[in-house]
Amino acid sequence: MLRSLYSGISGLRSHQTMLDVTGNNIANVNTTAFKASAAQFQDTLSQLTQAAGGATPTAGGTNPAQVGLGVQVAGISTNFAQGSSQATGKSTDLMISGDGFFVTALGGETLYTRAGSFEFDSAGRLVTPDGAIVQGWGAVDGVVADGGATGNISLPVGAIVPAEKSTAATFSGNLPSDAEDGSTLVRTVDVYDDLGNSRTVSLTFTRTTTPDGWTVGQTGGAPADVVQLTAETDADGPTGNFGDVTGFAVDGITINLNDLKGFSGLATVAGATDDGNEAGTLNSYTLGADGTLVGLFSNGQQQAIGRIALATFVNPGGLEKAGSSAYRATFNSGGAELGTPGAAGLGSLTSGALEMSNVDLSQEFTNLIVAQRGFQANARIITTSDEVLQELTNLKR
């Protein structure tokens, strides 16, 4: 039989594979974070019909004569170039800008994906559409310990941030320098005890006969337990500041008066606690560019709950596709190197966006034409070889 017949068959098979790869790329043009593939060809064994001959003093050397035996698929590579961004506005949609992969766990197997379309399930775990659980590091008392063993990223449903006792409060704003002597301003601030119970601390500001001066004391407190506020002056007169402001304590709360001013006309003094809060329950959450899941509590407090892990590979092209836009590590990809979003080589996260497919339709349709024409050309090899064989069989007539 003619060798060209089998060469044509190998060409059909190889170009059919190219058509399959190209068709799959086009089919996934709108698949989240899909990475296009490409088929590479190489020739097969060649039959040596004449060996090379070395040069002699009386004759020149001769090159080997070889007849190729067709083509085969050398490999199918994956293009891991960054896809474009698609804004979704959904807080659990995450896009990686960089080379990292999300780490997921499904059925006891660790998988890796670029597709950041996530949801929280009924158990509060962050999962992919097919149920793989996103992995990362949990937080203890709001502090994430990176670098250890990873676990499920989850929202602790019904979580409570404990109450914290108030220890300090700050009064700021303006005490009017043109207020009448003896006039008073009463201002309050709410503080918390160890159990989160709220109570009110009240201060009375009294205008003194000292130029632009005031005294401050606890409302209803002893007259001796007051602080004198003396207006500060320079060569041009009053500066609007109080000199040598000394804080004091009221019922165990340190009062800070350093932000008070003394300009005319305005009475804007107000108090605020520097710390302390009542107990709060988890209301909502945010996801940051560094992968930190932050819980927002009913008492206004924010606390880190966990941080999403990202993985990189020495050879991402060695990853094996596992379906559902996921990959698994192989011997040739190397082991996963874990880190936090924002670290070198891993990339940062964007919440409310997804990475689009990196399929280039213009390139894929060109590849489709090339594969089709290659298939047709190899089919002609077979039909032509068949005609030659037909002529051979007709020689007997």
PLM region spans:
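N-terminal intrinsically disordered, low-complexity, charge/repeat-rich segments that act as generic
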Residues: 1-43
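Small/polar low-complexity and glycine-rich loop motifs
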Residues: 2, 28, 35-367, 374
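Structured functional modules or segments
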Residues: 388-397
